[in-house]
Amino acid sequence: GSLVPASTASLLMGPYNVPAYQCGVHCVMTNKTGVGTFRAPGRYESCFIRERLLDMAAADLGIDPAELRFKNLIQPSQMPYNAGRTRADGDTVFDSGNYPQGLTKALEQIGYEQTNPKRWIDDTGRYHGLGIATYVKNTGRGPYEGARIVVSDTGQVDVYLGITTMGQGHETTMAQICADSLGVPMDIVTIFHGNTDYIPFGGGTYGSRGTVMGGNAVHLACQNLQERILSLASTYLDTEPANLVFQRGEIFRKGEELGPALLSLGEIACLAADAPSIEGEPPGLETTAYFESDQLTFSYGSHAAHVAV
């Protein structure tokens, strides 16, 4: 279909500062497809085209391929960098990154500067060569992602995700995000996914969006839940929320975090069961949050290889 050629065109210029370019793609129906969509469609196609063109240009100009790349990489001071309307639904905006630093580190790993010439034949007749390439990859596609968090009266924290894991490791990643954002030990957090009875809406797991979108949904839910926890605790303790701190799964008086806890998370969950009589809120200690985004975020990197054939 159109996914691979469209993605190839949208990222063809990669991490380079190209003021103006035009790209056309053509789709051809065939029953002898050379490659198919599996992971990151259009990414390796665009990288191969671009990086080979750079190598060819460097050879024509008689300069080092790495030097040509450094001369044309987008600089950190140019961030956020608007690459223009390279996709159907809007401009491509690189939000952050230090592309020259990434390439420098990759070259250091293979001793690029100390290796001259860059292509040679050793005493055994093997051909050696050094290759380098850089890339950017769009991730975090919206429009939204959701998470629901429920705290039991034993203090157990259950997190229900709108995304579904298929080996990506969301159970670990989302538990870490929840523990850090909410202020609880990671071992009391349990992650659930793939059940629309608990959270009916989700955007799906694809395009490296899980951590960006799902992680932000978990973080947002944790912030909402922490506000509720402090509100319940302050009402019960007859003080202001600003005078309390919630960390390590317990309530402390501000400035006395190393002292005895005033309330545990389980005790706060029990208070939440009587919430209507305490603060006029619905009973139960839980929250659902949806994170929305209309922009992509971009990862980046550089690869360097020493190959002998």
Label for each model-derived stretch:
Residues 70-151:
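Accessory "access/gating" subregions that flank catalytic or transport cores
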Residues 58-67, 237:
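Short, charged, surface-exposed loops that flank catalytic or proteolytic processing sites
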